[in-house]
């Protein structure tokens, strides 16, 4: 869904309106980009999917990287300590795990779930919420996200029903209004899911044939990280890169999970990901406290290649955090 602001950006950069000097600069940049297509960028250029926007992908992801760090679109990393009194990391985890189940029940696209959690964290960074209303914040945030992403979205009554009618239709609509006002209607933002699609495509290049477990395993690790409050501090692109790193390690434990191509694509070195990857590994091994029952059950299904049940080493070799060496 394209916002008015995005439309304005596109209209302001119409090549037909450019002066000869501006057009020469645009043409120079495009030629330079085409001459330098290699590694991860080459994958985008080879894609026959018009939605992948191969020619413009570098500019698009550069814009998304700028957008993901905008203060207005980021939650406080310590909002539970600074803003909340009744809410704890554990209660937040229970809510998010339940919302994973709700998203499955309503057959929502994955981006709706990611946006929902983003809205919850941003709202709780601004407003103190009583524990009794936390579930209402969750379903109202999902109601907003479903309007933004879904072609056929659930009705307000469906969200009331899923809470066993703990809240009324008026409660949900009022909380929807409160969330929208608090977020100043800034609803579009990149999520972990935004970056995963491209990172996974690059990560598949090392396999002779596409690995069927890689994508669902990356998604599983990303959803586990959504449950964990300590991951709120990480930007979406870093979470996505960390999920790919750990997924590759789980699938091929004797091979270095990172590569020159992935480093170029993600803009992260292996060492940049260490803290986040180790948290994800703890979550995967259930060494961290937190509710993840719904997420684990979801990814134990055949349609997700049973990735929640893949065995893994207890820790990663120290050498995996060193810079990738090109041979």
Curated annotation (Swiss-Prot):
It comes from the Eukaryota. It holds the Pfam family Cyclin_N. Keywords: Cell cycle, Cell division, Cyclin. The keyword Cell inner membrane does not apply. One of its GO terms (biological process) is cell division. InterPro entries: Cyclin, Cyclin-like_dom, Cyclin-like_sf, Cyclin_A/B-like, Cyclin_C-dom, Cyclin_N, Cyclins_cyclin-box. PANTHER family: CYCLINS (PTHR10177). Belongs to the cyclin family. Cyclin AB subfamily. This is Cyclin-A3-3.
């Amino acid at each position: 869904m394209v916002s008015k602001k995005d439309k304005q950006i596109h209209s302001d950069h119409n090549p037909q309106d450019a002066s000869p000097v501006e057009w020469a600069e645009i043409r120079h940049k495009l030629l330079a980009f085409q001459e330098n297509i290699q590694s991860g960028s080459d994958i985008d250029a080879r894609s026959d999917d018009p939605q992948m926007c191969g020619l413009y992908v570098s500019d698009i992801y550069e814009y998304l990287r700028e957008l993901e760090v905008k203060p207005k679109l980021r939650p406080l990393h310590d909002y539970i300590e600074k803003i909340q009194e009744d809410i704890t990391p554990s209660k937040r985890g229970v809510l998010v795990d339940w919302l994973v189940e709700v998203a499955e029940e309503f057959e929502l696209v994955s981006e709706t779930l990611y946006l929902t959690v983003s809205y919850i964290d941003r709202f709780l960074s601004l407003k103190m919420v009583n524990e009794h209303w936390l579930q209402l914040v969750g379903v109202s945030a999902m109601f907003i996200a479903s309007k933004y992403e879904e072609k056929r979205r659930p009705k307000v009554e469906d969200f009331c029903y899923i809470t066993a009618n703990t809240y009324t239709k008026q409660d949900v609509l009022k909380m929807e209004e409160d969330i929208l006002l608090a977020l100043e209607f800034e609803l579009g933002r990149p999520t972990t899911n935004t970056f995963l699609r491209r990172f996974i495509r690059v990560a598949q290049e090392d396999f002779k044939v596409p690995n069927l477990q890689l994508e669902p395993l990356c998604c599983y690790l990303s959803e586990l990280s959504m449950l964990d409050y300590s991951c709120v501090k990480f930007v979406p692109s870093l979470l996505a890169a960390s999920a790919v790193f750990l997924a590759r390690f789980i699938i091929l434990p004797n091979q270095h999970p990172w590569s020159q191509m992935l480093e170029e694509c993600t803009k992260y070195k292996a060492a940049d990901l260490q803290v986040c990857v180790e948290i994800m590994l703890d979550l995967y091994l259930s060494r961290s406290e937190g509710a993840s029952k719904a997420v684990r059950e979801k990814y134990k299904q055949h349609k997700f290649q049973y990735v929640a049940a893949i065995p893994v080493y207890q820790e990663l070799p120290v050498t995996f955090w060193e810079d990738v060496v090109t041979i």
